[in-house]
Amino acid sequence: MVNPNKYIRKAIFDAVNATYPCFDTQVTGKKNPTQYVIISTQDKDIDKANKCNYRLEVATLLDIVCIYNGVGNVGSRLANDDMENTIMTLIENIQITGYTVINRRYEFPSNLDSSTSTQTVYRNFIRIVLTLE
């Protein structure tokens, strides 16, 4: 059984990166984007669906980030919500090289927003749970 994690990250990256900068684990390079997606944690479980083959259930967390620089009440969660909607459209029929996607499920963990004296950061999350064969 081949670990599907890198194939899932590649499929997500290919689907999202043309619309929003997409990174694996952390922002890299010299750019400092204010809107981006991080392909964060991945978990997987083996489901022995029947005696002939295995299925994998793989959960991948997307961290959708929108940063507003400035002091005071800057920015709005609206842009982050719009990003989430767009990303859902981009990934809704995602296919994984070398696997058949049996089921797709989406979970939406609580938002994580923060403010400092110089910026406000809004973060939404989408957990994509794929059942693969």
Put a short name on every predicted segment:
Residues M1-G29, D43-E133:
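Charged, amphipathic alpha-helical segments and their flanking helix caps
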Residues P33-D43:
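A short, hydrophobic beta-strand-centered structural micro-motif
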